[in-house]
């Protein structure tokens, strides 16, 4: 047996109820309740244990009969004032005894048990009120005592003594009151005499001044001090005093001056002191009182007027009840029993309150009964409380009953379906009912938290607004009283699915300004949850989850296996054509976009599984209904981040349509420029040849004229001599003398002639030498112009040699570089442009030739003064563009003429890149490909302005001055340096290593440029080298990646020596890998104007070489279509002052260098990291300074790069670079991790770099030793911390090398420059890109160089590695969190919090809320829903992510179809071939067909595959586009095989069609119906071709007849020529109209439409409209059939005309009319019919155009009636 304490403990545990959490109430403290129960138990135990002896000696009550005991109990009840209970007890006992078939055998025993149990029940609440004034709601009221049944008196009647004393007190009190009334002054106590209280006591001055004054409402009702000033309550400062300008007096004294008020009494200052009335003598007033003649409740001192009668209720409850009974009795008596009023049932107010609270929860009670058929609560008739009528109570209770009815109906409506049964109403309805249950739970919490001590009116007031909401929700759900009242009409079915969302949205819009709005918003948000999840899955991943078929889309699985347009049109279909049936109203305008978006993603998954949309791990913004301001901002931010990241992925993963078009336009412009250059070269050659021929002809003519002139003179002299001889023959002496003189004269003439001939020979030699020089100069010019042709040849030769080299290297050891020949390149420049400023500069040395590495560099011979002047003169001539003076000098036979290497074809670069990706382990020379530097050529900077004319190669005009201004105090050094040329040039050529060819004109961006410019600018200077320069390595290594850090250049005095590694070969040639020592004092040189290059400008930077240099303002940078290569101002020297770099340019692939890098004096040993080659540009476009004391550089404003920052390479410039380091550089590439926003610990050195994904960009940290000058572009970080960046694709790489560096964060660059939001700064970058944790600085040395990492123990390394793996796994798990689709909405049924609609109730009546419960909605949600309209909220929360993703998907689909699938080329192929835009193809095809047709071949002979295929292949050979890949898609097809070809039928070949094969997925756009339309147009065009062929054949026959039969003069022949001409005009008009409208106008409209298409549906629609327009304008529609019939008839007449012409031969010419044709009358008749039809067609088309139908026919009218032929006739 357990102890007493244990038993009591168990008893208390059993009695305590189970702990239940009741919303709105504090939880019951079980310990306290248990303690109180124990106290009761022990009190009962001890009360029975320790009793007095007197109480123990009681008469033995067990001997009394049980009935007597019951009667004793009933007597106790009557004594206690419970008469009805006593009567009820006696009545029940009598019934029990009188019952004949009582089931209980021992009735007495049962009654005895009940008697023993009497008084042992729980104490009643009201019985504790032992004091009349304790907690009495009537305290303070003057209420007369009621009868026996009044509970308030029954409290006293429990004790007889107290009852008697109370009666005595009452009598005494009544006597005292009567005496006081008789003895008191007149008027005292009058307002309270009797039952009525008038409430208007005017007995004394105190009452008048306080309660009866005008401002009585503004003061307290009682004042205990006569001197208290009554004033207005305090008013806040912000109150509006405009209505208080005039103050009303506080009291108007009626005795002083009744009826008259002066104006001064109403002024505010006159009322500052209230006037007090004097006391009157009451007895005098009573004696002199005269009653007013007016019948009113007028008293002394009261103003006259109507007074209200007092309310009956002021007489007290008892009086009201009696009066009600009296009136009811009167009605009964008057009606004679006709009016059966319900019997009044008096109920305690506490019971009514309890029943009311129960019925609010749907609980039936005695007061409220439930009507089962209508599911409504009904108030029992006659229920009332004391002091109120049944009708008034019934009106209050009926409202409460209505609330309970609505609650009950809503509870039934929102019941969850049975688990396991299918809910046909869908998920949206389930979500709506769960939201409704949540609201009802909140409502229950409000009811349960209401204390039962409130009055009925308070409860009715508190639940008024909640009741209105319940009533509204019942009406909303169709279960309200109004809905059920119209039972005659069929009830509308409650909407489900998207219609329910539209219904809720419309209701929310209609109720946006009342109290139901927040509840509707809550229900709308809950109901939208399943739909937004469906939309989320469909839009983002194309997943279709619709269990109940309630959403917009229906899946046809059989069509999903199709691979044509049926997959697109029938695989996923909308459930209805009405938009409202498919989507909610608020998504109506983007319903189609959402539908197409999911279809597009599924199509991309099917066609291109590797598309970035299918595998992208960028987190998507959520789609949900949001009313919170913070969440809305988060959504908008997430959308912006998502769009930015996806666009970055898109730019990296594929080429966009716009980029492709831009590239094509650039290539087109380049082609145009090259063509123009070629044309100008050919024209100049022609003009030169013509000029040379003209000069030669002129010379020949002059020589011939000179010969004729000499002959004439000689002949004249001979005649004169002959005449003289005749005169002198007579005299012999004279003859002899003449003979002697003649001989002497002949001798003199001979001598003179020899002298003249010698002089002529001398000057002819001089002129021939001059002519030869001129020819040589012209030859040089011509050679220079043919440079590009030579260059192509040499490039191909060089490729062959390089392939031979590779083969030889693979077979035998590498030979010295000098063995292999290689083409050289030259850097040409014009003469010095500052020569006119007074400084002498020998132009003979303005060019350095970097020849073939296999040949020694030939020394440049000195140029005589005349050659120099000639070069200067030629510079001003028309041929001076880009010439060098050495072009006019003779070239040694052994010296190979240098050429300019303009680049490597893009295909070779791509192949090399692919090879480098496929072979990660390769020999050293081929390990790194040229992909990094050369990819910059194929990439285009979309932010630059397209200047194709400037971006291409040489223009014929003279160059403009692009040289930098040179300080005048430095220019005198030019003359000094020119004197050193002869002494140093030979040494320099010996000591300089044999240079390899310059790389093609695009230098490696920025970092490659300084050395390239250095060499180019050195070509204009005399370079003095130190004596020890000859000790350098004879040749430099050739690096395929062409990295700048491969060069070992000595500049100035203070650079340390570098041991050169063994030289290596380079395929493409680097410009700056020679070991060049430059002397101390280098003069400044104004660089020559560099050549333009289509692949990028090569020298836009100001470079200074030397020790003491002054400032240089950099020249304006040039645009480059492949990205700018030199935005950095680079200074080389010892003391270099500041340079402000030019503004960097934008690049679509990201700017590659925003860091200002300084290289200091003392640089220690650095092992360069293995740089990762980059597809999108080089790694260093930076402002780099080399020298001893380098001042600061103000960095340009940094630009963000969508592909990541690429200028973070770990590049160090140091002293001792070992072979191992360069091998590292040759072999592979490592990449340090990328930065998030804060520095992370440094990476471990020995971790292998992970493979970089395609979107990754080479990024490394560029830095120098800590001893170098600090960067000014950011705060200095500690040496132990190094920022690392995490890539945007969740993969990281560990750098193989770290440096002690001071790195500037990009956000801190510059002073006062605002930080731009970059891709690395996004909020969820941490989730996307888990960075590997890194170790400290000491652990980061490479294995080749000793460092502190050797001292770290293995255990610490293992611990660090384990920690890194754990951190990596943790970050990886954050990436992949599974998002489950919830199929149960239990969370929505959890107990809600009362904050949901807390702003609807006044704060004084708000329900108590547990402060520990957090609010369900954030506070800004309520404010936001009040500030913004619902459409705006839905647009910002739902439309923003949807619109963002839909636009991304649509653009991706458009880019995929246009770029990957080349859709536009298919459209062009269809236009070329099926629409016969390619005239060569159409002409040859039609000629071949019609020739065989005209030859009389049968259908079996013509329409067989062999013949048709040969015809098609021949036509394609003639075609301009026959070699395109799409030409293979063409084939002939037969619709049917005719038995014979109908004669004179224009559609004789309608059985033949030209088919175009379209593969999946292009057949979604180019469908079978589209191909049929193409075929119809082709058929009509073939008819036109038949007409043209027919007319050509007619013309041929007429011409042959005219030639053979000589019928040209025949009259009939002339007539037939005119007939043919008119027919030809008609056919050509139709052909021109079709070509213009279909081939040109419709195509241009189609192209314009394609330029702006947004998604795949629009492409499909645009193509269908294009074809429809072509068919419509080609008159091939059914409505245009009458017009087409006329045209067919005309065509038939043309064919008939031909057959009539060729069927018979011409007759002989018998008469004056000439030859005649036998069928001429028939042909004349055919022509007449043709003319009739053509005029009729003209009239029909004119009417169509005038009516406005088919306005495009105006073109046809204009063509056919251009000279008003038809109109006039």
From Swiss-Prot:
Keyword Cytoplasm attached: yes
Functional note: Component of the gamma-tubulin ring complex (gTuRC) which mediates microtubule nucleation. The gTuRC regulates the minus-end nucleation of alpha-beta tubulin heterodimers that grow into microtubule protafilaments, a critical step in centrosome duplication and spindle formation.
One of the GO BP terms on file: microtubule nucleation
GO CC annotations on file: centrosome; cytoplasm; gamma-tubulin ring complex; microtubule; spindle pole
Biased composition (Basic and acidic residues): 1314-1326
Protein's UniProt keywords contain GTP-binding: no
Protein name per the record: Gamma-tubulin complex component 6
Biased amino acid composition, Polar residues: 820-831, 1332-1343
Main location: cytoplasm
Pfam family, one: GCP_N_terminal
Residue numbers spanned by region Disordered: 809-842, 859-881, 1284-1360
Keywords linked to the UniProt accession: Cytoplasm, Cytoskeleton, Microtubule
InterPro entries referenced in this protein's UniProt entry, alphabetically: GCP, GCP6_N, GCP_C, GCP_C_sf, GCP_N
Signal peptide: none
Family (UniProt): Belongs to the TUBGCP family.
Localization per Swiss-Prot or TrEMBL: Cytoplasm, Cytoskeleton, Microtubule organizing center, Centrosome
The organism's taxonomic lineage, starting at the top: Eukaryota, Metazoa, Chordata, Craniata, Vertebrata
GO MF annotation, one: microtubule binding
Superkingdom, taxonomy of origin: Eukaryota
Subunit structure: Component of the gamma-tubulin ring complex (gTuRC) consisting of TUBGCP2, TUBGCP3, TUBGCP4, TUBGCP5 and TUBGCP6 and gamma-tubulin TUBG1 or TUBG2. TUBGCP2, TUBGCP3, TUBGCP4, TUBGCP5 and TUBGCP6 assemble in a 5:5:2:1:1 stoichiometry; each is associated with a gamma-tubulin, thereby arranging 14 gamma-tubulins in a helical manner. Gamma-tubulin at the first position is blocked by TUBGCP3 at the last position, allowing 13 protafilaments to grow into a microtubule.
């Amino acid at each position: 047996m357990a102890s007493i304490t244990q038993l009591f403990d168990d008893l208390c545990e059993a009695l305590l109820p189970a702990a239940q959490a009741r919303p709105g109430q504090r939880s019951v403290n079980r310990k306290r309740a248990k303690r109180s129960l124990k106290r009761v138990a022990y009190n009962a135990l001890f009360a029975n244990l320790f009793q007095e002896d007197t109480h123990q000696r009681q008469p033995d009550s067990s001997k009394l009969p049980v009935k007597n005991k019951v009667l004793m109990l009933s007597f106790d009840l009557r004594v206690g004032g419970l008469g009805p209970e006593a009567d009820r007890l006696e009545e029940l006992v009598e019934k029990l005894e009188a019952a004949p078939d009582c089931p209980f055998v021992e009735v007495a025993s049962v009654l005895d048990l009940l008697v023993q149990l009497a008084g042992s029940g729980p104490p009643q609440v009201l019985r504790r009120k032992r004091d009349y004034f304790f907690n009495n709601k009537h305290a303070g009221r003057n209420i007369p005592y009621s009868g026996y049944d009044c509970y308030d008196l029954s409290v006293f009647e429990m004790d007889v003594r107290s009852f008697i004393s109370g009666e005595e007190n009452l009598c005494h009190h009544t006597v005292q009151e009567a005496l006081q009334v008789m003895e008191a002054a007149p008027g005292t106590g009058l307002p309270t005499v009797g039952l009525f209280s008038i409430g208007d006591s005017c007995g004394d001055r105190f009452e008048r001044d306080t309660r009866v004054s005008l401002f009585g409402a503004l003061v307290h009702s009682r004042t205990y001090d006569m001197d208290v000033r009554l004033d207005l309550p305090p008013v806040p400062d912000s109150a509006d005093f405009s209505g208080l300008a005039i103050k009303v007096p506080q009291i108007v004294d009626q005795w002083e001056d009744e009826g008259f008020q002066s104006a001064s009494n109403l002024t505010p200052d006159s009322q500052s002191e209230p006037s007090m009335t004097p006391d009157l003598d009451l007895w005098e007033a009573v004696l002199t009182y005269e009653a007013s003649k007016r019948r009113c409740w007028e008293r002394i001192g009261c103003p006259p007027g109507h007074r209200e009668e007092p309310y009956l209720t002021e007489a007290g409850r008892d009086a009201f009840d009696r009066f009600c009974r009296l009136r009811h009795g009167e009605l009964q008596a008057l009606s004679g029993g006709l009016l059966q009023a319900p019997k009044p049932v008096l109920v305690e107010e506490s019971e009514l309150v309890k029943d009311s609270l129960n019925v609010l929860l749907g609980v039936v009670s005695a007061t409220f009964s439930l009507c089962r058929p209508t599911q409504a609560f009904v108030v029992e008739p006659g229920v009332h409380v004391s002091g109120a009528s049944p009708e008034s109570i019934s009106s209050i209770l009926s409202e409460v009953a209505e609330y309970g009815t609505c609650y009950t109906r809503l509870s039934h409506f929102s019941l969850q379906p049975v688990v396991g049964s299918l809910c046909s109403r869908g998920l949206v309805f389930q979500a709506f009912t769960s939201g409704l249950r949540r609201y009802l739970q909140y409502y229950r919490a409000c009811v349960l938290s209401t204390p039962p001590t409130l009055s009925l009116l308070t409860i009715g007031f508190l639940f008024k607004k909640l009741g209105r909401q319940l009533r509204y929700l019942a009406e909303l759900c169709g279960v309200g009283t109004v809905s059920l009242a119209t039972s005659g009409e069929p009830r509308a079915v409650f909407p489900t699915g998207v219609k329910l969302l539209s219904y809720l949205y419309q209701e929310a819009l209609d109720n946006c300004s009342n109290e139901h709005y927040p509840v509707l918003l809550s229900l709308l948000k809950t109901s939208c949850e399943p739909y937004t999840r469906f939309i989320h899955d469909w839009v983002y991943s194309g997943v279709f989850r619709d269990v109940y078929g309630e959403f917009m889309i229906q899946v046809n699985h059989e069509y999903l296996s199709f691979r044509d347009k049926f997959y697109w049109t029938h695989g996923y279909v909308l459930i209805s054509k009405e938009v409202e049936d498919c989507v909610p109203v608020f998504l109506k305008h983007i319903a189609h976009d959402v539908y197409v978006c999911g279809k597009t993603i599924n199509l991309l998954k099917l066609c291109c599984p590797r598309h970035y949309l299918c595998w992208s791990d960028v987190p998507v913004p959520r789609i949900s209904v949001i009313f919170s301001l913070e969440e809305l901002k988060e959504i908008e931010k997430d959308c912006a981040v998502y769009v930015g990241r996806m666009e970055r992925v898109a730019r990296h993963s594929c080429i966009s349509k716009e980029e492709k078009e831009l590239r094509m336009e650039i290539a087109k412009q380049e082609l145009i420029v090259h063509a123009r250059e070629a044309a100008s070269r050919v024209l100049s050659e022609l003009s030169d040849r013509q000029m040379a021929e003209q000069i030669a002809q002129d010379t020949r003519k002059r020589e011939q004229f000179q010969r004729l002139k000499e002959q004439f003179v000689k002949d004249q002299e001979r005649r004169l001599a002959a005449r003289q001889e005749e005169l002198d023959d007579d005299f012999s002496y004279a003859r002899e003398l003449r003979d002697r003189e003649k001989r002497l004269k002949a001798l003199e003439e001979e001598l003179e002639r020899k002298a003249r001939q010698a002089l002529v020979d001398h000057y002819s030699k001089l002129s021939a030498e001059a002519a030869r020089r001129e020819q040589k100069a012209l030859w040089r010019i011509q050679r220079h112009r043919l440079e590009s042709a030579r260059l192509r040849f040499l490039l191909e030769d060089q490729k062959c040699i390089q392939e031979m080299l590779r083969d030889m290297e693979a077979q035998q050891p590498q030979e010295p570089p000098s063995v292999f020949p290689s083409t050289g390149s030259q850097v040409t420049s014009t003469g010095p442009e500052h020569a006119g400023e007074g400084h002498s500069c020998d132009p003979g040395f303005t060019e350095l030739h970097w020849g073939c590495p296999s040949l020694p560099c030939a020394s440049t011979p000195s140029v005589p003064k005349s050659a120099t002047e000639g070069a200067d003169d030629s510079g001003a001539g028309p041929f001076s563009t880009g010439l060098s003076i050495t072009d006019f000098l003779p070239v040694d036979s052994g010296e190979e003429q240098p050429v300019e290497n303009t680049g490597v074809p893009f295909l070779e670069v791509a192949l090399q890149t692919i090879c480098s990706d496929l072979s990660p382990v390769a020999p050293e020379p081929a390990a790194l490909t040229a992909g990094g530097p050369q990819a910059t050529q194929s990439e285009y900077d979309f932010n630059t302005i397209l200047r194709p004319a400037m971006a291409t190669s040489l223009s014929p005009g003279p160059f403009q001055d692009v040289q930098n201004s040179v300080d005048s105090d430095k220019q005198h050094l030019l003359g000094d340096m020119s004197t050193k040329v002869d002494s140093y040039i030979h040494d320099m050529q010996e000591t300089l290593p044999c240079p390899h060819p310059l790389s093609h004109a695009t230098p490696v961006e920025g970092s490659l440029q300084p050395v390239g410019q250095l060499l180019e600018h050195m070509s204009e200077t005399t370079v003095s080298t130190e004596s020890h320069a000859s000790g350098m390595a004879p040749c430099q290594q050739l690096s395929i990646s062409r990295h700048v850090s491969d060069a070992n250049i000595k500049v100035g005095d203070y650079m340390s020596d570098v041991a050169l590694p063994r030289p290596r070969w380079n395929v493409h040639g680097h410009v700056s890998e020679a070991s060049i020592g430059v002397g101390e004092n280098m003069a400044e040189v104004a660089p020559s104007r560099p050549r333009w290059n289509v692949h990028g400008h090569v020298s836009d930077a100001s470079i200074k070489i030397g020790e003491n240099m002054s400032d240089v303002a950099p020249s304006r940078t040039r645009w480059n279509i492949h990205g700018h290569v030199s935005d950095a101002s680079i200074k080389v020297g010892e003391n270099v002052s500041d340079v402000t770099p030019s503004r960097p340019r934008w690049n679509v692939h990201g700017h590659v260098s925003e860091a200002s890098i300084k290289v200091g004096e003392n640089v220690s040993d650095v092992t360069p990291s293995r740089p990762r080659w980059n597809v999108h540009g080089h790694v260093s476009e930076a402002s780099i300074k080399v020298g001893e004391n380098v001042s600061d550089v103000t960095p340009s404003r940094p630009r963000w790069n969508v592909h990541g920052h690429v200028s973070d390479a770990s590049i160090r410039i140091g002293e001792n670079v070992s072979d191992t380091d360069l091998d590292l550089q040759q072999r592979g590439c490592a990449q340090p991790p990328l930065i998030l926003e804060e520095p992370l610990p440094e990476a471990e050195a020995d971790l292998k770099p992970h493979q970089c994904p395609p979107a990754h960009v080479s990024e490394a940290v560029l830095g120098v030793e800590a001893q170098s000058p600090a960067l000014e572009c950011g705060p200095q970080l500690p040496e132990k911390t190094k920022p690392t960046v995490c890539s945007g694709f969740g993969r990281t790489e560990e750098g193989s090398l770290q440096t002690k560096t001071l790195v500037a964060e990009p956000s801190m660059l510059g002073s006062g420059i605002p930080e731009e939001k970059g891709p690395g700064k996004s909020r969820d970058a941490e989730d996307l890109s888990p960075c590997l944790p890194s170790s400290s600085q000491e652990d980061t040395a490479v294995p080749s160089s000793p460092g502190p990492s050797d001292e770290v123990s293995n255990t610490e390394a293992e611990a660090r590695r384990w920690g890194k793996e754990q951190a990596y796994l943790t970050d990886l798990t954050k990436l992949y969190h599974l998002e489950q689709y919830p199929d149960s909405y239990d969370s929505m049924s959890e107990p809600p919090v009362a904050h949901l609609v807390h702003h609807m109730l006044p704060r004084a009546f708000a329900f108590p809320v547990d402060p520990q419960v957090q609010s369900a909605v954030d506070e800004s949600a309520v404010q936001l829903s009040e500030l913004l309209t619902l459409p705006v909220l839905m647009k910002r929360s739902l439309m923003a992510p949807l619109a963002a993703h839909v636009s991304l998907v649509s653009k991706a689909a458009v880019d995929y179809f246009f770029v990957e699938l080349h859709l536009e080329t298919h459209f062009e192929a269809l236009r070329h071939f099926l629409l016969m835009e390619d005239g060569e193809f159409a002409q040859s095809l039609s000629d071949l067909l019609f020739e065989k047709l005209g030859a009389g071949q049968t259908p079996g002979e013509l329409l067989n595959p062999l013949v048709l295929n040969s015809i098609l292949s021949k036509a394609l050979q003639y075609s301009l586009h026959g070699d395109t890949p799409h030409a293979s898609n063409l084939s002939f097809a037969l619709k049917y095989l005719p038995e014979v070809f109908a004669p004179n039928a224009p559609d004789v070949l309608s059985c033949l069609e030209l088919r175009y094969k379209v593969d999946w997925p292009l057949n979604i756009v180019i469908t079978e119906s589209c191909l049929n339309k193409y075929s119809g147009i082709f058929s009509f065009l073939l008819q036109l071709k038949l007409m043209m062929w027919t007319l050509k054949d007619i013309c041929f026959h007429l011409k042959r007849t005219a030639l053979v039969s000589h019928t040209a003069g025949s009259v009939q022949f002339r007539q037939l020529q005119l007939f043919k001409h008119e027919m030809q005009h008609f056919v050509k008009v139709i052909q021109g109209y079709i070509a213009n409208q279909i081939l040109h106008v419709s195509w241009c409209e189609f192209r314009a439409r394609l330029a702006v298409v947004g998604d795949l549906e629009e492409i499909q629609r645009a193509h269908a409209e294009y074809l429809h327009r072509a068919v419509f304008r080609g008159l091939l529609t059914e409505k245009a059939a009458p017009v087409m019939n006329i045209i067919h008839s005309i065509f038939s007449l043309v064919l008939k005309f031909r057959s009539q012409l060729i069927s018979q031969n011409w007759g002989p010419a018998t008469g004056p009319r000439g030859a005649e044709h036998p069928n001429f009358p028939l042909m004349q008749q055919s022509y007449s019919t043709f003319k009739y039809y053509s005029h009729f067609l003209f009239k029909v088309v004119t009417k169509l155009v005038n009516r406005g139908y088919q306005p495009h026919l105006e073109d046809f009218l204009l063509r056919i009636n251009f000279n008003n032929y038809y109109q006039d006739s």
